[in-house]
């Protein structure tokens, strides 16, 4: 009888805003649900995911620096480097071209496909805005104690000249009140005493 292989350990570096933190928690929740060991020790992780921010130049630089830092550890403990988040939706193809050490890309719309991407890798998507809105049924592994972010909406409809959020987070779309109430109750059951909107 063959013994099932235990999925490898995964570490995640989360950069950027509270929406990115929720996206990171969904990534971790889906991986944990699929049996992956989640580790805070990036040096000991078989796979490292960098969840990027692309809002301002400083955030882009911080994201690139984190990607390059993990890329330098490939073969020295880190087996795979995956990149997620806003930079993937906006600059995924450039990242694939300029940083060949990246093994796969997780767009904002493919968060729940993370296990497949961990196992098989994934090509950089063409630049495109997100269309998904995750609800209370998405698995979530909390990274904070006592409080949690409740993502009530996604995207933006304002075409401000100084901001590109609609280009990768997509047009504004709200979650239903029922979904928000269900998630708030789930978070309370997990010991969360404060919700940040």
Regions found by a protein language model. Name each.
Residues 1-196:
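Proteins enriched for Cys/Gly/acidic motifs involved in redox and nucleic-acid/cofactor modification
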């Amino acid at each position: 009888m063959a013994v099932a292989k235990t999925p490898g350990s995964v570490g995640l570096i989360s950069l950027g805003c509270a929406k990115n933190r929720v996206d990171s928690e969904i990534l971790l929740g889906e991986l944990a649900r699929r049996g992956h060991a989640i580790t805070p020790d990036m040096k000991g992780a078989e796979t490292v995911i960098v969840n990027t921010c692309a809002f301002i130049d400083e955030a882009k630089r911080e994201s690139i620096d984190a990607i390059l830092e993990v890329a330098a550890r490939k073969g020295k403990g880190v087996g795979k480097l995956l990149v997620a988040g806003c930079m993937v939706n906006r600059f995924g193809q450039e990242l694939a071209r300029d940083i060949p050490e990246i093994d796969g890309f997780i767009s904002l719309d493919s968060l729940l496909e993370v296990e497949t991407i961990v196992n098989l890798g994934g090509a950089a998507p063409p630049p495109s805005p997100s269309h998904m809105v995750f609800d209370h049924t998405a698995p979530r592994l909390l990274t904070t104690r006592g409080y949690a972010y409740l993502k009530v909406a996604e995207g933006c409809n304002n075409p401000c000249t100084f901001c590109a959020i609609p280009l990768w987070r997509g047009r504004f779309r709200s979650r239903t009140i029922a979904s928000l109430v269900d998630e708030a109750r789930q978070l309370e059951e997990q010991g969360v005493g404060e919700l940040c909107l």
